[in-house]
């Protein structure tokens, strides 16, 4: 393979697939990705002081990889009202969080106006303590809430932005292929609908992240297709702030008990996903985030030499990975994140949601 040309040019979806299929040049791929990372974003590794707030675990969704959801009436089910969500955001702001990530479930009771009320309450209660970025509601949540409110997606996004939504997590992407989605998340929004929500969010002035969950039933061609879709959206809107690969946690996932499902990705595939993503996106999506919650500290550190340049956040509360079988904790202090970066010879830098460095 011509790795020299791969450094300079925009590689095609076909070449992306060839990189995933290649088993002989693993370290060449890693070396190229790390070189591109250094050229594009330098040696800084960014992180955000943030808190996750899940306002309910009750959900009507049928995602086969989710072990977090509860039914109405379950002993462990909970549902926070907007005031309770706001109090959690205030607690996070008081101890230094610059971002709160707020997500819930899919329920008839949750419409766009309920989401807007959460945003307003959070902004109001935290205002005396300085600005906090609200990073909230997946594309699936936005679509479901809009339907419950009798709104179209554009109308819903306008209301959310006016109510204080700063950015959105680009989750619910999983694998952007409807055949795969019919297996792993049959009632979740279709590929075209996910594209529609995030594209309209960008056009409304709401930046989003983008994600890819791998290591379950997908094949290499699905990975290449997914990355190509994301790059095409970015060319059109420029609205993605980061790409976050999400390795499938199989231990408690209902999906794992079906015949075709793999027991997660190998460590080699984890690192290839980071590396190939960097080679494929180059500077179109500059920031690639590693997930210490899913990979653990050591593999996350290795990924920083495979194309990644962001180590995510402190989180303070992260229940979804934990429920699925994640064993790496739900909180990491700012000092621990810094030490994790320094240990691999890189420079830790605190950022906000928009990737602006906080000195």
UniProtKB/Swiss-Prot annotation:
[4Fe-4S] cluster binds at residues 59, 63, 66. Binds 1 [4Fe-4S] cluster. The cluster is coordinated with 3 cysteines and an exchangeable S-adenosyl-L-methionine. Its cofactor is [4Fe-4S] cluster. It catalyses: 5-amino-6-(D-ribitylamino)uracil + L-tyrosine + S-adenosyl-L-methionine = 5-amino-5-(4-hydroxybenzyl)-6-(D-ribitylimino)-5,6-dihydrouracil + 2-iminoacetate + 5'-deoxyadenosine + L-methionine + H(+). One of its GO terms (molecular function) is iron ion binding. Its EC number is 2.5.1.147. It holds the Pfam family CofH_C. It is an enzyme of class 2 (transferase). Keywords: 4Fe-4S, Iron, Iron-sulfur, Metal-binding, S-adenosyl-L-methionine, Transferase. PROSITE patterns: RADICAL_SAM. Residues 45-282 form the Radical SAM core domain. Pathway: Cofactor biosynthesis; coenzyme F0 biosynthesis. Belongs to the radical SAM superfamily. CofH family. NCBIfam families: CofH family radical SAM protein, F420_cofH, PRK07360.1. Catalyzes the radical-mediated synthesis of 5-amino-5-(4-hydroxybenzyl)-6-(D-ribitylimino)-5,6-dihydrouracil from 5-amino-6-(D-ribitylamino)uracil and L-tyrosine. PANTHER family: FO SYNTHASE (COFH), LIPOYL SYNTHASE 2. HAMAP family: FO_synth_sub2 (MF_01612). Consists of two subunits, CofG and CofH. This is 5-amino-6-(D-ribitylamino)uracil--L-tyrosine 4-hydroxyphenyl transferase.
